[in-house]
Amino acid sequence: MSGKERTEENGAVKQDTKEQVKKSADNGDKGVDEVDFAKIGLEDAFKYLNCSEHGLSGAEAEARLKQHGPNKLPDNSRNPVLVYFGYMWNPLAWAMEAAAIIAIALVDGADFALIVGLLIINATISFVEESNADKAIKALSAALAPKAMALRNGAMVTIDAVDLVPGDVILIRIGNVVPADVKLLPEHGADDYETPVQIDQAALTGESLPAKKFTGNVAFSGSTVKQGERHAVVYATGVNTFFGRAAALISGTHNVANIQRVMNRIGGLCLITIGVWVVIEVPVQFAHYKHSCVAGKEGCPTLLNMLVILVGAIPIAMPTVLSVTLALGAYKLAREGAIVTRMSAVEEMAGLDVLCSDKTGTLTLNKLSIDPSNVFPVGTMDIPEVMKFGALSANIITEEPIDMVLWESYPEREKLKSEYKHTKYFPFNPNDKITIATVLEIATGRVFRVLKGSPQVVLAKAWNAQALDGPVNEKIKEYAGRGFRSLGIAMAEGDGKDGTKWEMLAVLPMFDPPRHDTKETIERCMKQGIAVKMVTGDHLLIGKETAKMLGMGTEMYPSEVLIKARNGDVEAPHGYKNYVAMVEACNGFAQVFPEHKFEIVEILQEAHHRVGMTGDGVNDAPALKKAHVGVAVADATDAARGAADIVLTEPGLSTIVTAVIGARKIFKRMTTYAKYTISVTFRIAFTFGLLTVIYDWYFPTILIVILAVFNDGAMIALSKDRVVASVLPSTWNLATIFVPGFVYAMWLTLSSWALYQVATHSTFFERMTPLPSLNTQHATLISWCEDEISSKLGVNPQDSLCTYPSYADQLNECKGSVSLSSQVPGVPTILDQCVTEQRYIRDALTRALIYTHLSVSGQAVVFVVRTSGFSLKEVAGVSTYVAFALAQFGATMFGIFGLGGYNKPRQNFDNCQFCDYSTHNRVLFFNSEVEPRAGTESVYTASVIGCGGYVIVAWIWAALFYTALDPLKWGLMWIMNDDGFRDRHAWRKSNHEAMERRSREQLDNKEFAGPSGMVPANFSNPLGRASMSKPVSALLDRKSASLVAINRSSMTVSHDPNHALNIGRRSMIGRPSGPLGRNSNTGQSNPLNSSSVEIKPDAPNKV
């Protein structure tokens, strides 16, 4: 569309809208919202906005900001109260809430209060920790807030997009997300033609192709500039934009993160386990043990006992610990320069095994330099003149790297500002790969154009392209072989209207040096199981040369090979089975367009790789979205940042690797807790399920709640634990969580059952220690009570309890005319009462013992599951040790002092004479001194009395069984090959055997079928270097040879054999040769050893 046609079109609609314009103007600011700016002309738009093409003043902008508000949508933040209670609304919390309902229904106020308290504590910790982490991440993310270039006070300045107001004149260019609804202004210097700005509106309108926008057209907030740049006037901001009005009608999708699925599965398995044990326990207790269930307080101890499994087998803290670990980890990543825009991306980053990286700015410094002496002129101009035209081609306003290096490379650049002026500028875009500047020479009025860009594209536009093809392409290859990027420069007289042909001026070499840490970072990636593939738009030879410098491997292909292979060309995969195998095996691709990045990601994902892709441009957005982890590098465009999962604030590959390792540490902490919580919850369910079914043994719910508060609360410390990142990509494998967790749970269940069995069914502890007996076997109790009654009371154990004075006054059966005979109907004997009391007190002591052992042995599992090595050797974080110490100190104190009986029996006496015989001191019960009455054992609830010195037994017992957990872990890791455990050991073994075999072959004088100049490898010479097969002194005594000492930058030659001999011998003093020529004590490389020596009879001074 020509400028004239557009003017006529605007004129046609102008008359139709004149009344609307007038009406809106009369209504003041309200009219701005009502006017259809797409249909009115620029003059009317400026009138309504009360502004001009020169923008606004600072004071006016500030006043409008107060009037119209910030340029952002209202915060979609949820009510904090609803967020808080949301932590109590999930399947795990529902189970706890069901337990609370059962407790209150059974008039068990203490358990009800404790369960509700546990829910509140859990929700509070979740709310506070996640809120703090979220605020911290938002604060760090503020630096990534969208910016805009606005004309304020007559100068173009960069401001936060949120501060834009109607009437601002802004500059939008390629890669920008349009920050507000705008109307395009005329292109600078355009007359009868103009270059359209291409804007992607797919997110707003669904259009698949970018829309071409001309002067007077509107562009909506949220759309992306795909090509071109233009000044525009803002007419709507915030909620008044097209996007803002539509936002209320858009319902966002709820994506369930992988971590949520994992939590659901773990929670589901725990609920199934609970259900199984409830189905088993209830019939056994009611049918086999003949328990009753009546109304009233403590009237149904069977159901109260169900609460032990219901509360203990629910990992109530799991959502808290895992979400807090993820949030705090994301905050730490943000501080290290990697801001997470999608929380679940942390998990996916941990599983990354292929990273496709840009070359420029990521692997290299993106600090270009031009050496004028290496410039290759192809016309009549000399080099200074070529550099002048290069400077004139640059648009220094946008500060693009190539523009800036061209400008800075011309010494007299400041003079150009007063002698020349840009009248029009065609910006770079990934498709055309050129820029065109129309330049006016102020003194003469001469107009000419300067073109720069890809040398092949520039060459194709030259009028004599055929003649220049050979020398230009040869020079491009020469530059590429030296690691230089090439830039073509051309010029043409006139403004292009007369069809003047282009004349190519020169090819300029630009060098972008690798970052100092890139090579080391790539080596770290390889050690971490991440394959780094270079994806660059530069020439293939440049890519290979850079890859060679970085030690990446040089198996690279141009992108056209990939396209041919995918389109069915059987020869294109270069000998590989198919294009997928080629992409997997190669080290990268060159001459890549943005759409090729998408193809590369898609192919790698077809091969089941977890793919990361870096990008910075607007056309990189599809590939960034497609990748499992899209990484927007530092200084990326708004569009790239919007599409990325991770936004880097620091340049370079090292930040990405640091983020990957950090993500793996976060993942390690989450899997550590997952294994821990599986083992602990299963252990509680199986331990108390078995004890109840086999022995009809009860345990108070209060201790399980306290256990959850102490141990699960302490596990928050895992979110900050010191862990070693996995050397392999980490993904959720529930088998490696459930199976070890179940095995550890069974082992711990065995330990608890064994402790209970030894304590209550044997005399081991009373024989081996001065501690009181906990044996509750009926025969043992009868024998013990008979001896105690006879020796201490001097009465017949078979006499009625009425004959014992302290009980006679309490029993109605003993009062009145009843004779204190040896036998009273309905009154138990002294022996019966003693047995009942002893069973009661010993069970109460045993519960304190079992509780202490449960707590210590259960939480100690975390030290086993947090590392694949020896748990006592691998040091955990200080917070983990402190949390363990505090939790177990509390548990030990409960074990020592108990709860004063906790619950008194339903039928009782005021004293417990025979309890004292067992504990050696007075038993202090809850509220009052009470005891059970013989014959009512099945209707009293479980009490807890401090077991004193038995806590030492609990610790020792836990320690003994702990010693087997590491071997169990290693066996499981071997069987399941967890974290590549079996592969690593198999590799070490095969490598060891291979080296031994080669050593034996050498000793047996077998012929070595290896490369020329090599010998069989052995332990002293692992690389099989021939020079190491002879003594160093024999090598140095060859006087006819010149010794060449090699370093990284050059090879210095000594022609004096004696000098070389002394240097060599000096360097070897005190340096025993270890593998790879390293000092076996220090691990440092020798400056001169047999692996860095080459003999050359006639060597020049420098090579």
UniProtKB/Swiss-Prot annotation:
Protein name: Plasma membrane ATPase
Keyword Membrane: yes
Catalytic activity, as annotated: ATP + H2O + H(+)(in) = ADP + phosphate + 2 H(+)(out)
Family: Belongs to the cation transport ATPase (P-type) (TC 3.A.3) family. Type IIIA subfamily.
Active site, renumbered: D358 (4-aspartylphosphate intermediate)
UniProtKB keywords: ATP-binding, Cell membrane, Hydrogen ion transport, Ion transport, Magnesium, Membrane, Metal-binding, Nucleotide-binding, Phosphoprotein, Translocase, Transmembrane, Transmembrane helix, Transport
EC numbers on record: 7.1.2.1
Entry superkingdom: Eukaryota
Signal peptide: none
SUPFAM superfamilies from the UniProt entry: Calcium ATPase, transduction domain A (SSF81653), Calcium ATPase, transmembrane domain M (SSF81665), HAD-like (SSF56784)
Compositionally biased spans, kind Polar residues: 1078-1093
Gene3D superfamilies (alphabetical): Calcium-transporting ATPase, cytoplasmic domain N, Calcium-transporting ATPase, cytoplasmic transduction domain A, Calcium-transporting ATPase, transmembrane domain, HAD superfamily/HAD-like
Membrane topology: Multi-pass membrane protein
Molecular-function GO terms, alphabetical: ATP binding; ATP hydrolysis activity; metal ion binding; P-type proton-exporting transporter activity
Region (Disordered): 1-32, 1054-1103
Function: The plasma membrane ATPase of plants and fungi is a hydrogen ion pump. The proton gradient it generates drives the active transport of nutrients by H(+)-symport. The resulting external acidification and/or internal alkinization may mediate growth responses.
Positions bound to Mg(2+): D616, D620
Pfam families on file: Cation_ATPase_N, E1-E2_ATPase, Hydrolase
Disulfide links within the chain: none
GO biological process: proton export across plasma membrane
Subcellular location: Cell membrane
Example of a GO cellular component annotation carried by this entry: plasma membrane
Parts of the chain that traverse the membrane: 80-100, 101-121, 154-174, 232-252, 266-286, 306-326, 643-663, 690-710, 734-754, 845-865, 881-901, 944-964
Top class in the EC scheme: translocase
Keyword Transmembrane helix: yes
Major location (coarse): membrane
